[in-house]
UniProtKB/Swiss-Prot annotation:
Protein name (database record): 2,3-bisphosphoglycerate-dependent phosphoglycerate mutase
Gene behind this protein: gpmA
Binding site for substrate: 9-16, 22-23, 61, 88-91, 99, 115-116, 184-185
Keywords: Gluconeogenesis, Glycolysis, Isomerase
Residues at the active site: 10 (tele-phosphohistidine intermediate), 88 (proton donor/acceptor)
Assembly description: Homodimer.
CDD domains referenced in this protein's UniProt entry, alphabetically: HP_PGM_like
A Pfam family this chain is assigned to: His_Phos_1
Record field: catalytic activity: (2R)-2-phosphoglycerate = (2R)-3-phosphoglycerate
Length: 249
């Protein structure tokens, strides 16, 4: 039996448009981002996907993308689970900074390492910073020590995997079709795990906003195939645009 999983990065956010490091900052979708959510829903509808359950983060850009896609799918009723474990990677002291200006200051290669390397985190955010997640009530029930002040992709994967094993994988094994709407780096972490991508190869992986990535898995959740829905060239161009965000102007 083939199990189907769709990974969907949220639509364009205001800080995507502004080319700023976002991380755990809770920013809105742009009008284009809202349109991308609807377009993602249409692509999934055209594919004939009938979901049983959906998962998303606790950040509104992912939540609103999921809502827009489900409305287009006419599957608004779908059970939705939200978890902080699907949040974007925490960008530490880089959050809020302009990516191009940061590249001009520190060099494009350093910014690429911070953005795309596997195990090197950006400079940490101080726990006394008002933006640290320990001051956000949505995380009030969590162990303060579990809340990051910065993350690498490696530590993001460590955060995401328990949710995969405890929540998503059992549903897939039960034969359910699952939609996960999350963020560039939490989805890169899942992609790395599912496809057994090396630490070096993951550096070059960029996930575009608003384009569903369909995985077909076997009974043991091993990947049989995966592809972006819609025009492959459009997905390629969108991924290249993501890669270019960390370059100096």
């Amino acid at each position: 039996m083939t199990r189907k999983l769709v990974l969907l990065r949220h639509g364009q956010s205001q800080w995507n448009l502004d080319n700023r490091f976002t991380g755990w900052v809770d920013v809105e979708l742009t009008d284009q981002g809202c349109q991308e959510a609807v377009a993602a829903g249409k692509l999934m509808k055209d594919e004939g996907l009938q979901f049983d359950v959906a998962h998303t983060s606790v950040l509104k850009r992912a939540i609103h993308t999921l809502q827009g896609a489900l409305k287009e799918l006419d599957q608004d009723w779908l059970p939705v689970s939200k978890s902080w474990r699907l949040n974007e990677r925490h960008y530490g002291g880089l959050q809020g900074l302009d990516k191009a200006e940061t590249a001009a200051k520190h060099g494009e290669e350093q910014v690429k390492i911070w953005r795309r390397s596997y195990d090197i985190p950006p400079p940490a955010m101080d726990v006394d910073d008002p933006g640290h997640p320990c001051h956000d009530r949505r995380y009030a029930t969590l162990d303060r020590n579990a809340l990051p002040g910065t993350e690498s992709l490696a530590t993001t994967l460590v955060r995401v995997l328990p949710y995969w094993h405890d929540a998503i994988a059992p549903q897939l094994k039960a034969g359910q079709t699952v939609l996960v709407t999350a963020h560039g780096n939490s989805l890169r972490a899942l992609y790395k795990y599912l496809n057994d991508v090396s630490n070096e190869q993951i550096l070059e992986l960029n996930i575009p906003t608003g384009i569903p990535l369909l995985f077909e898995l076997d009974d043991n959740l091993q990947v049989r195939s995966f592809r972006y829905l819609g025009d492959p060239e459009a997905a390629k161009r969108a991924a290249e645009a993501v890669a270019n965000q960390g370059k100096a102007k």
